[in-house]
Each structure stands twice: as C-alpha cells, then as structure tokens.
Amino acid sequence: CPMGIDLAGLVSMARHGMFKAGLIPHELHEVAKRADETGSPLGITADKFEDRIEWMADEHDVEIPVDKEKADVLALMSSIEIQKYPQSIAATAQIMKAAGEDWTFRLDGFEATNFGMLSGNPEWQKKATMKIIDAAIKIGAKTVVLPECGHAYMALRWQGANMLGKPLPFKVMHITEYLSDALDKGKIRVKKVDKSVTYHDPCQVSRRGGATKAARNVIKHLGVDFREMEFGGDYNWCCGGGGGVVTITRADPLRRRVFKLKMDQVEKTEADQLLSACANC
C-alpha cells in the first residue's frame, strides 16, 4: 500500500472474524483441522516423516540426523516436500554436511507450514508454532532453517515471538537466506549453470518478509543468465494460489486468472527456467 497501511494485517483480522463466525471456506477449514489433529495439512505424522528420512538416507547414501539431543541448527520441512518431493530431505542433509553444520531434524517439531494462521484460528496457529519453538529450545538451537514455504516464514520469523510472548532465543532463516549466507562465507560451493532463468518471489518471503535479496544472491553464485521479470522483487505479483486459496475450489476461476497474469510476465522474459522458493507458488 502506498500509504503504508498493513493490508495483510487487516486480512488476518478478517480471517479471524470469519473463523469465529463459522464462515471460513470448508476446504480450508478441513485442511487446517487436519493439520491441528495430525501435525500436518497433508496428514504427515512423525512416523511417516521418519520413514521418508530412512528411505532418502538409503536412496542418496547420506547420513540424516534425527532427534539429536543438542544441535546448533534445527532444520524444518514442509508436508508437500515430505509427500511429493522427498528428495528435499536428502538435499537438506547434503547441504548441511557440506557446510559442516551441527544440525538435526526433530520428530517433535518438523512441520514448517501453519494452516492455523491461514484459517484465522490463532489457537491452531500458536499450537503449530510452539511445536517448533519448543523443539528448538529443547536442543539449544542457535538457528532454525525454514524450507520452501512462504507463509511458514511469516508464521515463525515475524509472528513466532508473539506466540512465545518474548523474543525468540534463536535466529530464523528461510532456506534462501541460509544458502545465501553459506555461499558468501564459502561454507558451500556450487557449480556454474549455463542457463537463463527468471525468479518468482513468494509474497510472504520477499515483499512482506524482507528476504528479497537472498534468492538473487544464490542465483548470482550460480552464474546463470538471470532475467528479472517486469514486476519482480518487492514489486512481485502473486502467483494466485497463496494464503490458502489453493485449497478453495470455488476460488479456482479467480486463481487461474491471476496465474495467467503471472505467467504472461514469466514468458516475457524468455528464460529457460523459472525458479521459486515456494512449492505452492
């Protein structure tokens, strides 16, 4: 907003009112309820996550620490990664190993997404957030690294302290921020990539979250031909499916119209590949 009005904050208040009035879209309510009951919007339990970890450790021949009593870094996953892109689990382990990190996954605090926030139910939001905070405090983590999810960044990085009631005793980094920092410090190195790429900014990470430069620094290290969209960075246009809209069937026509606008911007760059830091996007 050019006048500095926090529109997203007003939307959050409206969501809360809709939830209390029983007017939340039923699809979004069911996903949020499942997340509250099982710990994950896709029903990923701790046992299933552990199974996926064992599978990926064997598949990619990499050690993946789980439930270490003490660690400097707590890494989180999103349910969509665990369910649909489990190689992200192994990739995280490979990155942490290359960076020389003392890190772990925790079965009592692994899910980064927060549908309590999206549904407008602050009780569900706090419950999901406190699982992560409690797990991080338990192991004495200095840093919590968040995965691809945009709203997960907002929920913990910018609203987590409100849930705890005091400043968080650890640093919160989106995976793009972690990679950017690790590359700048020489903790990890990457091969140069001969491609042209453009980048879609997740709204909650870039414009609202403030981590706009991190992904671009990672892209710079890759040495690609980077083609910024006409509306990129803090001026990025939404993908059309954020804020839980992707779960709401009757919103599909609107979501597709917004997505068409976004894809027109992408195609104008004539880039070989589109990158993003949010699986939902």
Question: Positions of the model-derived regions?
Answer:
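Short, structured patches in soluble enzyme cores that scaffold and shape functional sites
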Residues: 77, 148, 174-176, 201
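Active-site glycine-rich loop that binds ribose-phosphate moieties when present
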Residues: 126-132, 178-185
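General small-molecule cofactor/ligand-binding pocket signal
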Residues: 104-106, 171-173, 227-229
